[in-house]
Structures are given as structure tokens and as C-alpha cells.
Amino acid sequence: MATVPELNCEMPPFDSDENDLFFEVDGPQKMKGCFQTFDLGCPDESIQLQISQQHINKSFRQAVSLIVAVEKLWQLPVSFPWTFQDEDMSTFFSFIFEEEPILCDSWDDDDNLLVCDVPIRQLHYRLRDEQQKSLVLSDPYELKALHLNGQNINQQVIFSMSFVQGEPSNDKIPVALGLKGKNLYLSCVMKDGTPTLQLESVDPKQYPKKKMEKRFVFNKIEVKSKVEFESAEFPNWYISTSQAEHKPVFLGNNSGQDIIDFTMESVSS
């Protein structure tokens, strides 16, 4: 018959009359002063097992007694001194979860704010001034206004109007105006001391975006059945056309005979 080898490590003497109590249903409750009182409400306190320094002979029964004693302790009923509240969960969350910083490569240079772009609303329109002149792409980077009819009506450009961030206002809607199918956007810059309208080439991977640079932003203002486009970079300067035929579209300050009122014709995507 196989024999159980003797344990080689030091172990306290549990071979006493009280050891048998651990094998009873309510054994540990009958023992007094054997274990330290503990409170689960305090994370720094716990059950402590003290090992005696006495050197005695060990047996398999002593090892089993220790194991059974620990198992019995797990089953001891404990009355909690407080009612568990939601805020108590924060104590455990700090051990379970680890905070990590949120990193983003894009920061707003003006306001030093974190910018997270999302898909923006975009509609397509044809624009005509109040004299019904259409806007066409004359040179690679120049728009002109002229009357079209017949087959050449398809020469007029289609604008991709993106609704972007801008100054809060009840009667002004900030938009960016790009040419559909081309990487060109209308922008306003200062040239020779005068606010100037131009077509600017952009990276299609970066544009359009919700937070457009201010030179690209126009405040769309509805006046009865017409619309005006005021430069956000240069207030009181508007996208304008001349009374004359076949003249470039420019940025004007609503003086003289400049035309700043347009009609919009919606185009399906």
C-alpha cells in the first residue's frame, strides 16, 4: 500500500482537541480567540495566520486540518457595518481600470483646443447673380460671370457648399464653397492692401473639414429670395459680380454697381 510522505516544511501544531471542531458544521464558531476579528469594510485589514515557531513532527492530518480551517473561514458569515453605495465602487475601479491619456494629432492653432472633425453636411448648387449671369471657370483659377444659353448652359460650375464652424449668428450661416469635382475652394486673402477673392487648390485628403481656415469661410445671408456671401476673414466684403458681361468674380464691399445678390439652384448629388 502506498504511503503518504511526511511534509518537510515547518507547520504550527494543529493536532489538538480543537482541531476536530473544524470538521463540524459550526466548528469555527465554537472556537474563541483563535483568529483575529476582521472587517471587510477596511481594505488594510484581513485575516492573519500566525505560524508558531515550535518544532514538532508533522503529519498528513495536520496539513489537512489547516486546509479545512481555511475553507471554513471562507464560509464565515460577516455582517457589513455599512450599506454599500454607488460611490463605494470607485474604490474598486482604481484597482480594476487603468487611466490612459487621450492622444490626438490635431490641435486648433487659434484657440489651442482639441479639434475632432466629423463628416460634415454638404449640398450642391449652381449660382446666378440677380441679372441671371452664370458663373463659369474661365482660367484654371478664375471664375467669370456671363449669360449662358442653349448647349453652353452646362459650362456653369457647380458649387459644393459645406456647412462649417464659424461665428455664432442668427442670420448668418458659415459655409465653404468648393468646386464640385475639383480640388478648388474660394478663399479670401489680402493682396496689395485689398481683400481679394481667389480659387485656392487644396489637398482632397484634408478638405473639406468642419473647422476650415477662416479665409475659406463665408457667411451665407438670406435676403428675401436672394443670398449673399460675406467673407468671414473680411467682414462687409462680399462675393460680387460686375454689371458688365464676362468679368471676373471678385470680392467687393457693396459699393457702386457691384452685384452681391445671388440665386441658388439645387443640384442632386
UniProtKB/Swiss-Prot annotation:
One GO CC term, this protein: extracellular space
Propeptide: 1-117
GO molecular function, one term: cytokine activity
Residues the UniProt record annotates as site (Important for interaction with integrin): K172, K180, K182, K191, K205
Primary residence: cytoplasm
Keyword Secreted set for record: yes
A UniProt-annotated Pfam family: IL1
Any one GO biological process: positive regulation of mitotic nuclear division
Gene3D superfamilies linked: 2.80.10.50
Tissue specificity field: Expressed in activated macrophages (at protein level).
Any coiled-coil regions, as ranges: none
Sorted UniProt keywords: Cytokine, Cytoplasm, Inflammatory response, Lysosome, Mitogen, Pyrogen, Secreted
Subcellular location(s) of the protein: Cytoplasm, Cytosol; Secreted; Lysosome; Secreted, Extracellular exosome
Induction: By LPS.
Stated role: Potent pro-inflammatory cytokine. Initially discovered as the major endogenous pyrogen, induces prostaglandin synthesis, neutrophil influx and activation, T-cell activation and cytokine production, B-cell activation and antibody production, and fibroblast proliferation and collagen production. Promotes Th17 differentiation of T-cells. Synergizes with IL12/interleukin-12 to induce IFNG synthesis from T-helper 1 (Th1) cells. Plays a role in angiogenesis by inducing VEGF production synergistically with TNF and IL6.
Binding partners and assembly: Monomer. Interacts with MEFV. Interacts with integrins ITGAV:ITGBV and ITGA5:ITGB1; integrin-binding is required for IL1B signaling. Interacts with cargo receptor TMED10; the interaction is direct and is required for the secretion of IL1B mature form. Interacts with HSP90AB1; the interaction facilitates cargo translocation into the ERGIC. Interacts with HSP90B1; the interaction facilitates cargo translocation into the ERGIC.
Family: Belongs to the IL-1 family.
Misc remark: IL1B production occurs in 2 steps, each being controlled by different stimuli. First, inflammatory signals, such as LPS, stimulate the synthesis and promote the accumulation of cytosolic stores of pro-IL1B (priming). Then additional signals are required for inflammasome assembly, leading to CASP1 activation, pro-IL1B processing and eventually secretion of the active cytokine. IL1B processing and secretion are temporarily associated.
Name assigned to this protein: Interleukin-1 beta
Organism name: Mus musculus
